[in-house]
Regions:
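Beta-strand-rich recognition/accessory modules
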Residues: 3-20, 29, 58, 128-185, ...
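Beta-sheet entry/capping signal
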Residues: 23-25, 32-34, 199
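Short polybasic amphipathic segments
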Residues: 24, 42-48, 242-244
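Hydrophobic beta-strand positions
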Residues: 25-26, 188
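Acidic-aromatic substrate-binding/catalytic surfaces of carbohydrate-active enzymes
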Residues: 29-144
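Acidic (Asp/Glu-rich), glycine- and aromatic
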Residues: 38-64, 69-71, 165-169, 177-221, ...
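Short, surface-exposed, polar/charged, turn-prone segments marking secondary-structure boundaries
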Residues: 53-55, 61-65, 72-76, 213-217, ...
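Active-site/ligand-binding surface loops and adjacent short beta/alpha elements
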Residues: 194-199, 204-265
């Protein structure tokens, strides 16, 4: 059987999340990935077999019933108009938890294609309150699978309107035999309409188990960041390589960019309820490389991103 060989690769269309639409599932000896072509061609699962770990084991932030108690205890009210009980207040294990109640409009995955509005900030993206132009995380992408030397390419493409200008985003994801790495070739094309300035950023989520562990650190070309834990947030400029060293799962993750980018990093944290009270809970680390570009009529801009995973 092909599974007796080292270099087998299976590609199938399968309704992996039971939402009525097929996803693309690619499996190799080193791992598997799931691409949701109906929601922006994003990756929703990325298994790295050497670590027995799904790097995308995260979730979208959603309202929970008990969040009302947190808001009420902060405002001095109690939902129904009465005062918040001492019990409700004392159950918050951290101060100002109400400031961390943010909710997501899309699933947190990988290769989520954003076109940002001019007033976008790291904080607004972190809170999911930024202006999303073109709706790329929500639209269906076309998909096709191509055989190439030493592997396969999944070709994905979507179109959207940026202030009246039609723009296409194509991303070709190359998976090679015998390698856990992915090479993503992006092309942003001006299809029709006026010339346009575009602020493009693909989102990567990495579920790293523990946001505050000293065994899980961000690094760039110059070594570990000064604030390197997974709950840190910040902006790094002129980046061509960025990574996460995670000794909890003995894995080194790297992202390299053919065009220098500005890179945002921040954690996805939910406010959860446990027996001991309300508290923030780390879910994943978000990395968003982004570029500002100008497209004339018929113009095109491209970047190559390589995602590497290595045992350490």
């Amino acid at each position: 059987s092909r599974h007796g060989k080292h270099n087998w690769m299976e590609v199938e269309n399968f309704d992996f999340d039971c939402d009525g639409s097929d996803e693309v599932l690619i499996t190799t000896p080193l791992g598997s990935l799931v691409i949701d072509t109906h929601k922006g061609g994003m990756l929703t699962e990325l298994d790295y077999r050497p670590a027995s770990f799904n790097i995308l084991n995260t979730l979208a932030r959603r309202p929970e019933v008990y969040h009302k108690k947190i808001i009420a205890s902060n405002s001095g009210g109690h939902g129904e108009g009465g005062p918040a009980s001492i019990h409700d207040i004392s159950r918050s294990k951290e101060a100002d938890l109400h400031l961390h109640l943010h909710y997501d409009s899309y699933r947190r995955g990988m290769l989520i294609d954003h076109i940002f509005g001019d007033n976008t900030t790291l904080e607004s993206v972190m809170q999911n309150k930024h202006e999303e132009i073109g709706g790329f995380p929500f639209i269906p992408y076309t998909s096709s699978i191509k055989d190439v030397r030493n592997g396969k390419v999944v070709a994905l493409a979507g179109e959207g309107l940026i202030h009246g200008t039609k723009i296409s985003i194509t991303k070709n994801i190359k998976i090679e035999h015998g390698s856990p790495d992915m090479e993503i070739n992006y092309a942003i094309r001006h299809v029709s309409g006026e010339p346009r300035d575009i602020w493009f950023g693909p989102e990567f989520n990495f579920a790293m188990l523990n946001g505050k562990s000293e065994f899980c650190k961000y690094y760039a070309e110059g070594g570990f960041l000064e604030d390197s834990c997974q709950t840190s947030k910040g902006e790094s400029k002129e980046i061509t390589y960025f990574g996460i060293e995670n000794r909890l799962i003995s894995t080194n993750i790297g992202l390299s960019f053919s065009e220098a980018c500005t890179l945002w990093r921040f954690p996805i944290e939910t406010v959860s309820q446990s027996e001991s009270g309300f508290e923030k809970e780390y879910q994943s680390s978000v990395l968003i490389p982004h570029w500002r570009l100008h497209l004339e009529q018929g113009g095109e801009w491209g970047v190559k991103i390589r995602l590497t995973m290595r045992e350490i």
